[in-house]
Amino acid sequence: SNKRCNIYNQGVRNRILYREEELSAGDMLMITKNNYYWTENIEGIDFLANGEIVEVLRVRREQELYGFRFCDVLVRSLDYDIEFEIKILMDTLYSDVSGLPRERAEELFLNILEDYSDISTKAGKMKKLKTDPFYNAVQVKFAYAVTCHKAQGGEWSTVFLDLGYISEEHLGINFYRWLYTAITRAGKKLYLVNLP
């Protein structure tokens, strides 16, 4: 679950990497929602894909605005080995869901839309919104531990699979499909944790 991933991510950051800051250079982040805004002018990258991992190279400016927290960071795409600047939405880092919940996304939308109240047409407001860096902030989570859903399509040499909180009523066909997907993410080593 996202909740368990948050616990593991904090454990890795605090006890293995000795990171005390909320976000540090060297942190690995996973994009949790496709984003086209920040790569428009970067040759070779069409968009930041849901599930893509980036490394934080430098943490720049943090801001609180519209009832949300943002941070400008310099990142490197692991897929393309290209460095670029993005604005991330800090509120998604520790959220117990994969991205920004619908109610909070709507709140962000409406709060930013107020900045364009001087524009009379809805189309004009939407055009401005599409170019707003805060509205287009990248939704991310730490990438040291990820859910099986987010891991689909990827492979890691070593995988730790937490089977805690699996009760007998979950042991149906969907569980075995999930288990197959999780097991096949491991390229070399698989460790089963919290076996029932």
Can you say where each PLM-predicted feature lies in the sequence?
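Core RecA-like ATPase module of SF1/SF2 helicases and allied nucleic-acid translocases
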Residues: N2-L195
